[in-house]
Amino acid sequence: MNKLQEEWNRFCASWMFNTRLPILPFYVYSESTLSRSSRYFPLIGWIVSAGTSYSTYFLSWILPIEISIILGMILSVLITGGFHEDGLADVCDAFGGGWSKEKILEIMKDSRIGTFGSIGLILSLGLKYLLLVNLFKISPWIFLFTSWFSHSASRWFALLLMMLIPYARENDLSKSKPMIKKLPPFDFALSTFFGCFPAVYFLYQFQNQIPNVLLGFFLSSIFVFYFRNYFNKWIEGFTGDCLGFIQQGTELLFYLGITVSWNSI
């Protein structure tokens, strides 16, 4: 297998893992490919953002902003299969109702949603809706660029958690386990490029917005390092659901950082 085909397979594996979109052509499965595909998680964020934010933007030509935002959020869930939202709900249920590592991990594996998960989803989706509406009213271009770097950087922060603490399920045989292990240095550097380039480009286009973006990164960093300690204390590591929780949380914090900064001007 040549190098180009190998990289394509890694990207396709990441595509399949993070979205419900059709399988890309010329993909050849192998576990070695799967194990290094997480380097492209932030790049998948570019694709999800492009599909949802530009659909919202074009819908706003014929529909009220609020309805366009709702439809864009629905499209995001359809593209990803609610993958990260499911992780957020499972973490809320598990840590809200569990009192030991074994019980927390058991609740996470339960496919049913409970009270804490429902509350977490309602609050996070409601906050996301309000923040996106506010960003769009500030400027459609601010909305588009913020969506781009928030989707990519939030997935990078999920990878950062993987680098900081071990996987919590020692004997897990799930198909996703090969994807959720520490990245080699080059892979993490590549994911950092895909995760941070949109923010750098945003600053290039809006050079007076450095404090806004830095606030988002600052809030997200505090969030990740707090939950690194929290997860390590209770389950001695992370699970795939923890990564979804981190992605959703940091995405919201980027939206919040830009919103706070703009409304303080």
From Swiss-Prot:
A GO MF annotation of the entry reads: adenosylcobinamide-GDP ribazoletransferase activity
Compartments where found: Cell inner membrane
Q: Which cofactor does it need?
A: Mg(2+)
Q: Which GO terms describe its cellular component?
A: plasma membrane
What is this entry's stated membrane topology? Multi-pass membrane protein
| Disulfide feature | none
Supply the enzyme class, top level: transferase
GO BP terms in the entry: cobalamin biosynthetic process
Q: Which UniProt keywords apply?
A: Cell inner membrane, Cell membrane, Cobalamin biosynthesis, Magnesium, Membrane, Transferase, Transmembrane, Transmembrane helix
| Regions annotated as coiled coil | none
Pathways per UniProt: Cofactor biosynthesis; adenosylcobalamin biosynthesis; adenosylcobalamin from cob(II)yrinate a,c-diamide: step 7/7
Q: What is its EC number?
A: 2.7.8.26
The transmembrane segments are 59-79, 113-133, 141-161, 183-203, 206-226
Catalytic reaction(s) noted:
alpha-ribazole + adenosylcob(III)inamide-GDP = adenosylcob(III)alamin + GMP + H(+); alpha-ribazole 5'-phosphate + adenosylcob(III)inamide-GDP = adenosylcob(III)alamin 5'-phosphate + GMP + H(+)
The record's section on InterPro entries has: CobS
Q: Which family does it belong to?
A: Belongs to the CobS family.
Q: Which HAMAP family match?
A: CobS
What's the stated role of this polypeptide? Joins adenosylcobinamide-GDP and alpha-ribazole to generate adenosylcobalamin (Ado-cobalamin). Also synthesizes adenosylcobalamin 5'-phosphate from adenosylcobinamide-GDP and alpha-ribazole 5'-phosphate.
Name recorded for this polypeptide? Adenosylcobinamide-GDP ribazoletransferase
Species of the source? Leptospira interrogans serogroup Icterohaemorrhagiae serovar Lai (strain 56601)
